[in-house]
Amino acid sequence: MQKKSDDPYERLLLLHLQHYGFLSDNSSGIPIKREWEGIQDSTASDMINSSSPSESSDSNLEEEQEESKPCSNFFSLNKALRTRQLVFDFDGERPIPRLRDPLDLFTIPSTSCPFQGVRWPIECDVICDKIQHIEWDPSEPETFYQPTGNEQTPMPVGEVRGNTVYCIDPATKASSFTYSRVGGSRGPIKSATSCANNQKEPTLAFESRFECGNLQKAVQVGQYDYGLTLRTDLYTTKHTQWFYFRVRNMREGVTYRFTIINLMKSSSLYGAGMCPLLYSEKTAWLKGEGWKRTGSSIRYYRNNIEQDGKALYSLTWTLEFPYDGDTCYLAHCYPYTYSKLQHYLREVISDPVRAAYCKLRVLCRSLAGNAVYVLTITAPSSSLAERKAKRAVVVTARVHPGETNGSWMMQGFLEFLLSDLPDAHLLRETFIFKVIPMLNPDGVVVGNYRCSLAGRDLNRNYRSMLRDSFPCIWYTRNMVKRLLAEREVVVYCDFHGHSRKNNVFMYGCNERKDASQCLQERVFPLMMSKNAKDKFSFRSCKFKMHKSKEGTGRIVMWRLGIRNSYTMESTFGGSTLGDRKGTHFSTLDLKSMGYCFCDTLLDFCDPDPAKMTRCLEELGVLLKQEIRRKLGREVDSLENLSDIDIESSTSGSNSTESDGLPVHLLNVTNQGKKKLLRSRKERNRLRQGRVQSAGKTDASKPYSCQTLNATTQHGDTEDQS
């Protein structure tokens, strides 16, 4: 039995814990104040004065384990100091005080405290259906679509010749984000289905008012032909690439055509054989099969519509649904919702084995109030010196909400790192991992492709001081700054998706000032290509730092002092390498890149320099070959070459489309200034000046209001207007 304490507070706390089932006996592991043998107060003060400085700033970096030691000094110190704010670590027999971890400002998810509901902007209608998909990977890789040359290119016909069967509010219904609530708008959900003409044949029933969905309008232009309009990123008129919506009321054996009419990129992987994705609930139930590549007659082309003076593009494809009356989903890439992330994190913290070395905290709240989670993963340290010797690795994902492949790579990374594999154990013993699996939860929830609810690309605002407008980015950068003040960060990597290039590759930062380090940043990507030969393309990696990309996480972290700072880009399509050439990536393929990242990290930090030396030698040869190909001359030394000589443009995204102030501040600056009304005295003074300049009167004679009024009435000075 637990020995009763004389302290009334301790007795109350004990009863409280017992009442809620957190404490039943001594095996509970919750320390309660005990009576210990007496000790001099001077002994306690001597121990504190001789101990190492408090590591309160490091308390969030790894999972702290309270070790029960048969040492009465520890408890007598607490009693002598009369404080519960200090806890003690032991380096041998020597107690080292540190501040107790502060209570979290936000709720920490746990089995006894469920995750907070998903918050939506108040103007968003949200259906109550719980959308869930099974994870499944095909037994054989799915091949690219091979064009026949006979693909049709239907042009948009508008609502005059078509029948609108689905329509929701546009992204610009509100000019900027105001506030949010769980479940979105208040009151009953408005119907989004309409039918202008009576149809003998049943029409498809569309829906997208759920997490990550973004279909705005569906127009039936033929019996089985539908024109689709995607909703742009919320509070913007740009960024239509990602799509995800539900379809019901279909017929089996009928060929349907879908044409998305408002895509904004001039080129796409759909032109290189990429296929859309289809999920059938009946197929999942009957066969246990999930997302599949689908479609024929696939074509990506420019249509006859313009928006803001820019041409729009269409994606068209045909398909047959497998069952009558099924519920199906169509998507650009494998969806990965905010709720799915919460479900996965709940599993992690509910497992006592993984929870021993994985601490989950809330880094901050997004604009809508959704939690931005950060995981600290490391093995418990046996001593203070061992803890301080660990280097750090920072990994983030999903700053662009439509790049769901980044979340699948992140899940693979976490699955490997939290597993019981020997390599995973070695990684946890060697490093402290700071992981932010979803940087832009608001954008993910509402189905944006690129922006947050500020209407801006977060990956262009890592330098911004606007904490309230870009909280997820501001707190991430601040966390890394504090981490760098305590220990070396060996690698930073942000997981992304790419819409124009196949394979997986990296963007890095080139060291231009130190020629001896010009190859160092290329070693990690080269090792990745060796560990994933049929998926990772080193030749697609770029290391230029464009001025327009100065606000990206990769460059900002590099300027903070992280030499190996990267974004890892995974295609939406598939591979053009090795045995996987011409095949799509599955979710297992994407997760395998997370496994590969962990393997490469061990190779990169191997104490044996042999791998590093071989890679540097190979890089020197490859770089000279590339320069010879581009410049047409031999190069003996790499020291006098700039990155302009070495590589061309990264052909990345156009960052200017979503740069600038947050939308709500932009609207304030665009408001017209009110015209200031002048007083009568000011108007009279101005009128007097005009009279004098006209030379109709004696300039030396002062004019009074009475004289001025008289001359005005006689029309001698100026016209009435």
From Swiss-Prot:
Membrane spanning stretches: none
Keywords from the UniProt entry: Carboxypeptidase, Cell projection, Cytoplasm, Cytoskeleton, Hydrolase, Metal-binding, Metalloprotease, Protease, Zinc
Keyword Zinc applies: yes
InterPro entries: Cytosolic_carboxypeptidase, Pepdidase_M14_N, Peptidase_M14
Disordered: region residues: 43-71, 645-721
Active site (catalytic residues): 569
Polar residues bias spans: 703-714
Any Gene Ontology CC annotation: cytoplasm
Biased composition (Basic residues): 672-688
Role played: Metallocarboxypeptidase that mediates deglutamylation of target proteins. Catalyzes the deglutamylation of polyglutamate side chains generated by post-translational polyglutamylation in proteins such as tubulins. Also removes gene-encoded polyglutamates from the carboxy-terminus of target proteins such as MYLK. Does not show detyrosinase or deglycylase activities from the carboxy-terminus of tubulin. Metallocarboxypeptidase that mediates deglutamylation of tubulin and non-tubulin target proteins. Catalyzes the removal of polyglutamate side chains present on the gamma-carboxyl group of glutamate residues within the C-terminal tail of tubulin protein. Specifically cleaves tubulin long-side-chains, while it is not able to remove the branching point glutamate. Also catalyzes the removal of polyglutamate residues from the carboxy-terminus of non-tubulin proteins.
Designated name of the protein: Cytosolic carboxypeptidase 2
